[in-house]
Amino acid sequence: MAEFVLVAHGTRSAAGVENIAALAEAVSRRVGSVRTAFVDVLGPTPSEVLSTIDGPAVLLPAFLASGYHVHHDIPEHVALSGHPQVAITQTLGPDPVLASVLAGRLRAAGWRRGDAVVLAAAGSSDARARHEVHTAASLLARHTGPVRVGYIATGEPRVADVVREARATGRRVFIASYLLAQGLFQQRLAECGADGVAQPL
């Protein structure tokens, strides 16, 4: 039977680490034991975890879009481990279920119909990931009406700029956090000038 490894980005935020642990626990209730690995900031790495597994392994990328970490880092760790039997699942998003959760997070932050929505993602240099973020925005728009996209770390337009443009319409502006866990990026969203910021997924 295959062993499952949840692969996340990694964060120095204790709350973010707890978020990932809670996700791994939730997955384990569905599939059995789940180990956790990180591609950045924290350890163990996917290659380190894979080196301790004798049988087949399934890597579960805990990412909301398939950017550099998914297309480069994770396969590189698989190759580095030398493990002969590794399957890699798709990323968590975009997905209609996540869009529904995002809409709920927005309502909890005070958003009401008619307010402007900015979907904030970490960003990526990978065009595939950017396309997936726009797909996520389209899925969210089914719940909220038009959704603009902004990036926190990589890519344009930046979240603060998109919030400023949306505010020029005279409406309240809310940020939908397309982030998986608490951490530095979520903290930065509070500084973007919106009327409210939803909690991460």
Task: Please describe what each predicted stretch is.
Residues 1-201:
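Active-site-proximal alpha-helix that buttresses catalytic centers in soluble enzyme cores
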